[in-house]
């Protein structure tokens, strides 16, 4: 028996060896996974269930079944042919146990019978799907389970894993040992003992581990746990493991590692899902043996400790399944990311082909940017097409209205759109939200200054069936037709003929019926004066009733009224807000389209043909004339109040009518502003006049609903439109509307806004009516005024008026106007005082421009985009500082220099050389006031820098927006630099210099003076008034250089001679010197020319006295003091000479 068993074992080992050469661990693992995936596929395979139970101590039970016999036979063959007694075999019922946690596990468990299938003798076992058994509880049966702890590790850190697996232990004597319920320990010897662990195919969901004794008796394993802990010195015991396919609920798989890290593995639930052979590492060889009967045996090294561990110290928790490795997760993530990237790249390529074509080459960000730009372009095109479609639908609706078809569609229908379309497209026509947090249900652009409008709130929109016919209004052609018919009816009234026929019939009541002739006679009537007055009174009464009815029809019932919170009102406010946004952005074409849509919704569409324009213009002229008659207004108001049933209804309807008139007036006013400023394609003059009259008429009808400032703006805009469009033909109408606007300001101009206060001044009115200004030219950037609103004609005219005041102030300094008559020269106004008066007015008008106002405020229509004009204020301060320095007012120079020193950002950005020249000239004037020694040197340095910038400004070519203002500013700057250099030279000469003596200047001073004089000569070629300064400063440079005094005296004589305006050619008067130039020339001649050049000593004194009077009248205190000192010196010398 022993030899046969040994031979059988060797054959089995040879078969396992041959099978191991053909199969690998991966193949076996793949087969096991395949079988594990088939769980639940065949539920009827193990439908046979046995219900017999057995006691836990190894007591006998019922007789075994055929499956038990085959199982015993298989075991005997596996043991080398040892026979077993079939009567001793036991049969067990196959009952799965429910899964329980270690904390709730008890030592006693339910008993179950295992159906053991024999292992056929084949090289490769055939894998078949196993059904999942049905659980049947066995409350009486109890058994215990035994656990073997295997301690391999996978990582460097010690880890503990517990695996519970059913094992059948077979000793060397080919007999099975019964594992007892108590705690046991496996101790290895110094020699490696082969241990064979045979695992049978288990197909029960929850099964117990059975062992077979030497006599073939199978016993259940108790739930005792055997723990093996690897000591520091561990010996490997090769264990033969027969891998079988086991389907249970859970399994924790572990492998062995070569290091000695203790890993505790246990299976709390004996129901195993699969069992695979341990993975083979680099240092661990797992040989696989195949027996003769096809049994696969695998040796697995097991590290076993030498000490017993109590069961209480065994950890009861069961670790979860080991998560997938980091490398596997990373690989899966990379695959998914690669798919995502591929999909995104494909879509970007497709987007590039759609937007730029297949041949274009561009990176991904460029493709997305181009796509976004193209989408925005499509949105804009779609918006414009939608607007055009809306206008066409409204025009079609207007034609239907004229034909008497679908009269109620303009009131409560959204421009011939269905209510469902309105609800679907409610967000398409609304302006974009200002930020992402704005609610989509309300308009983010509603304001408090205007009446609330339910732009997007359907709950506030009234679904009224139809408005009264009075809300529809009449078109202008119908109004004119009614007026013409009324005029013809009154001119050719049939009532007059009827009354005359009735009187003739009364006189012929008793005619003569006989034959013969009758004599004409006059019969006196008995009625008296009542007979002939009654028909006349009756005729006038009937005609008055007819005319009054026509007025009521035209001015009350014929006016379109839009009820609040209706579909038409919602549409109007949506386009109105969008127009305001377009105006703020500068998209004037889109703003005009939205305003035209607003007027169409209000029932006041713009005329599209010449006939419509003629009828509309005629009706507005008639209406404006009727509104000026107070009797007509009073009668209409009384009739309107009587027409309504109750006072509350009349007041509500009157308020709605005024609100509709106000909205229409503002829309007409804004369209008129866009037309006269040239922001829209050029239209006819009649169209501009028509819009102006519509705005004025409706604004007057709105009465208190429209603010007074807006009403004044509407009249001023109408005046500007008539002046620019009609010119001299209808200039009286422009003056009429200007006077009308001034009368609206009140007697003391209390209600006039600050931005319009300049028109109440006589200079402003004169500039408005007499000066030629253009508002259709594109708004150019100016060095002298800040940028105004390009769509506001009043702001542009105000800008032109400010520049005109600045030009007048500078011209009064460099080009004083002389009187025509020589006798008036003494009474000529001082040039300094005139300049200061202009600058004072300019400063007040600049401050009254007004601050920034809300763009959607109904009280301000297209206000200026800026507050006070800081640029014009800076120029005002600079010119005032120059006048103060010329007058010798040092305190005023210092006070104004603090304002000039803060140059505005807008002027710094321009990098204009003229601005820099003026700035450094002001710094030079301020430095010259310093009493220190370096003050004159600093002033000289600033003069040099200002001279360089002035020369550059003269060399700048190209058209400028204000050429005349540039010339006078350049002339003033050049004159200031030359005067400043002369003053510095005279200071260096000192008080020790006597009369007739000359102090020669240095070469650097002469070079700077000659450079500025060259700039003055160059400016004189294009600006003739500069010659008067040339004749004054050329003698000065000759005196500084010590040149021939004869030529110097001849040049001074040009400024000293008196001239009259008689017999002078045109343009020569501009070259005549003014009073200040003549006084300055007298000072130079009397101080620096030799005494021999004057004819007599008395002549010098007379000239100095005249110069002192002139300088005192001008206000030049510094030069006047110098003149008086010279008179004192000259008086002493004259007395000595006379004695």
Curated annotation (Swiss-Prot):
GO terms for cellular component: endoplasmic reticulum membrane; ER to Golgi transport vesicle membrane; Golgi membrane; nucleus; SREBP-SCAP complex. Residues 378-399 are annotated as: Leucine-zipper. Residues 328-378 form the bHLH domain. Keywords: Activator, Cholesterol metabolism, Chromosomal rearrangement, Cytoplasmic vesicle, DNA-binding, Endoplasmic reticulum, Golgi apparatus, Isopeptide bond, Lipid metabolism, Membrane, Nucleus, Phosphoprotein, Steroid metabolism, Sterol metabolism, Transcription, Transcription regulation, Transmembrane, Transmembrane helix, Ubl conjugation. The record marks 460-461 as: Breakpoint for translocation to form SREBP-2 fusion proteins in srd phenotypes. The chain crosses the membrane at residues 480-500, 532-552. Residues 235-489 are annotated as: Interaction with LMNA. The modification Phosphoserine is found at residue 1096. This is Sterol regulatory element-binding protein 2. It comes from Cricetulus griseus.
